[in-house]
Amino acid sequence: MRFTSFPCSLLALCLFATPPLLAQGENDQPAPAGAPAATQQTPGEPGTQTGQPTPPPAPAPPVQFTRTIPVPPVRYSGSLGSTYIPLDSWMYPEIMRLYSLGFIDTVFLGMRPYTRTSVAHMLDASAGEIYNSDSDEAKDIYSALSRELAPDLEIPVDAHRGHSEIESVYTRMLGITGPPLRDPYHAGQTIVNDYGRPYAEGFNSITGLSVRTTLGRYSGYFRGEYQHAPTLWGYSTAVASQLSFQDEVFPLTYYNPTLPYGATLQGVDTFRIQEAYLAANFASHEISIGKSDEWYGPGRGGGMGYSNNAENIYSIRINRVEPAYIPFVSRFLGPIRYDFLYGSLQGHTAYNSPYTHSEGFSFKPTSNFEFGFERTIVFGGKGHEPVTWHTFLKGFFDINDTTEPEKIGRNDPGARFSAFNFSYRVPFVRNWLTFYSDSEAHDDVTPISAPRRAAMRPGIYLSHFPGAPKLSWRVEAVSTDPPTGRSIHGSFMYWEAEQRQAYTNKGFTFGDWIGREAKGGQSWLTYHLSGNEWVEFQYRNVKSAKDFIPMGTTQNDFTVSAVKRLGKDVEVNGWVQYERWKAPFLLNGNTAAQNDTSIAVQLTFYPRNSIRRY
């Protein structure tokens, strides 16, 4: 395949790009509307050079976010550190809805997570427009988001102060009756986009907390949790041997996280670090090291390039968290964001401990249209090529097809996957309907150059219905079985001849949960109670190809969920899911449908009084 070096040149140019021009100045960022306005002093008043010494400031009153006209914003530095918002936060569906209602034009849907201050800047840019609109839904969302982000927005531009706080404390109780599916690389999953958390029939639980801190341009984040799950019994020797043969992973062993075999998952009682990183902000670049969320693509159900379906990896990351303006380029392509990640993968046996790096670029030519490119490479591993600067740069800059001797030797550029996504607010119904698509190709420059060899996840989002402003609907289709002869036996998407467990981390696909050679879809019908509360019905369907899993597989999930606040700082998130699945080959030819029911309740406490400033 042929990869050009254009992304490399563009990345170098971006490092010298100027940030987007704001109303207050080139490098100053505004606080959200509703924050107290900065006051001016005249000579001779207390606190000036010609007056009396400044007395100790009185405690600032709480910021009130109401539906009143925004006051002049306070100036904030664009170089202050800020932590990422976790991908499972309630804020992301509300941000998407606010965009689809016709606001926050500066958001980049295809590149997540966002930092807390970047979301605050999006809100500030649309504050006046939201106020002047007749959309009560937009005002409710704006108020809820602004209140959540208020603690980050009280640091004056000339004070490199910081603060620490317990962001959340949470516990989730999950009961599963009936045999669930937990084989993301083959047959499918009962629970998706859950950071690869363990689950099995019986009682499962997680209890955790998250803390964050900032000091000037520096920030840190930690999220850890205790996890409990019963024993999960895997496949018989005959089934596991057949699947291992198709994967070309030999010999068959009990330790193979991508293939549940026997008592693969013993009862789990462990503490897991979900996220932990230190970061520094330089010219709107968040440079971090550690474990953080990653998502490429505008979809809700999954991201072809990256998602939170698997446990996060430890990585070094450079993320342009604010849109950049590049001279000449941005005249045609608009503001740009980019993200670079390099880290190690776990749970591989062929080969053990490979590395991965990804590069993503997103462009916004207009306020209604966004498109982006992303590339992921998996390389190295024990028994294969060494992980050196030579092998890294070989994959990063390689522009040629790979020969077989090169592929099995020390100069293998790695398993290369490229993605393309876009989103578009549809003309004439821009405040109603958003159309988007995500795609990924294996061994091609981009999915655009080879659409018949590309996996797809298209979708539409209707932000509200005529006469029912609180009701929204979203639907997505997904396929990793493109119409090409190469898509056979599960040996195309998310698989590679050398890196045979390529797109997995600890057994879970870190791209789209649909996995290899499957087709399906999802739909969400949501009734919004407020800016951070809703009731939702979800349907999910999956079918795996018969040439991949003998006799094929079928899954149908029906889920009812609700998110409700008890007061302002306690969130209750509950859901009930009924699943009906068929996988005759996995059950030694049994064609009867299997059923399982999952019931979960999660309580999350956001302790506002835990903030400590310094």
Describe the function of each predicted region.
Residues L21-G202, S210-G216:
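N-terminal periplasmic/intermembrane-space "pro-region" immediately following the signal or transit peptide
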Residues F361, K564, A593-Y614:
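Outer-membrane beta-barrel "beta-signal"
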Residues S210-L252, T366-N368:
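Carboxylate/His-rich catalytic cores and anion/metal-binding grooves
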Residues C8-T18:
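Bacterial N-terminal signal peptides
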Residues L109, Y195-A200, G262-Q266, M304-S307, ...:
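Outer-membrane beta-barrel domain signature
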